[in-house]
Design a protein with these regions (language model features):
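A short beta-loop-alpha structural element at the N-terminal edge
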Residues: 21-35
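Active-site rim helix/loop that mediates acceptor-substrate recognition in acyltransferases
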Residues: 54-76
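Conserved beta-hairpin
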Residues: 73-90
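Conserved acyl-donor/pantetheine-binding loop and adjacent beta-alpha core of acyl/acetyltransferases
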Residues: 87-149, 205
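Conserved GNAT acetyl-CoA-binding A-motif
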Residues: 141-143, 170-183
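Conserved acetyl-CoA-binding loop-helix of GNAT-fold acetyltransferases
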Residues: 147-150, 156-169
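Conserved active-site alpha-helix within GNAT-family acetyltransferase domains
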Residues: 161, 173-175, 184-201
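C-terminal "cap" of GNAT-fold acetyltransferases
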Residues: 176, 180-185, 204-223
């Protein structure tokens, strides 16, 4: 990722998030975020595939914790409050995927010890597929919603909108495309509500998992 992007765009986005009254996550919070995400992934097809078809709470938690640690310097990671009822992770334009060595040195070895070496292969297979689609639709010139997770007991209380709207307004102001993918059909309608269009729907090759690639064009009327 371009160092200039990290130096300028990421701090600018964080200022917008703070101005909206949201909480910029600190490194000390990453374990709690991983717990929130792992709980939300109990019925998520992709994570079940990562762990050979059966939900594994510890594996999901480790995947998220290692991923968040790896991208801390590059990402905009924020929550609704310090209570962390929900959080979002955005990566700026130029992101092409997590690097293997930082992933391993930030806790990936613990994931291997827990789940076996095969899980790294499945993670790489998915990320390669997902990043190729992102490049196809945005040429990597996008703000990428890597994760949006809400505690189950906090769902339906407007937290998703609280997290999404300031960043989407920022994308509109900057005339930037927003990109995301989901592997659960029920989520497609949620993201359409925020202005995302479904660009591709297909089964990931050699897996039972569906993939939904979505793009949101900047809305000039919001500027």
């Amino acid at each position: 990722m371009d160092k200039l992007v990290r130096k300028i765009e990421v701090p600018l986005a964080k200022k917008i998030i703070e101005k909206a009254g949201l909480y910029i996550v600190q490194k000390k919070d990453l374990a709690r975020l991983a717990e929130v995400a792992a709980d939300a992934y109990q019925d998520y097809p992709l994570h079940n595939w990562f762990t050979k078809g059966k939900y594994d709470a510890k594996a999901s938690r480790l995947i998220m914790q290692v991923s968040l640690k790896t991208m801390t310097e590059d990402a905009v990671i924020y929550a609704d409050s310090e209570e962390i009822n929900g959080f979002a992770v955005w990566l700026p334009f130029g992101f092409t995927g997590s690097k293997t060595i930082p992933f391993l040195t930030n806790g990936g070895l613990s994931l291997i010890f827990h789940s076996g070496l095969g899980i790294i292969g499945r993670l790489l297979t998915y990320e390669t597929y997902a990043m190729n689609l992102k490049k196809e639709f945005t040429d990597n010139y996008d703000w990428y919603l890597y994760n949006l997770s809400i505690k189950k007991e906090a769902q339906g209380k407007g937290i998703a909108s609280k997290l999404m709207r300031p960043m989407l307004q920022f994308c509109d102001d900057e005339r930037m495309v927003a990109y995301l993918e989901t592997n659960k059909e029920a989520n497609v309608g949620l993201y359409r509500h925020y202005g995302f269009d479904l660009m591709k729907e297909e089964q990931i090759p050699k897996t039972p998992v569906m993939h939904y690639a979505m793009v949101r064009q900047p809305n000039p009327t919001n500027v």
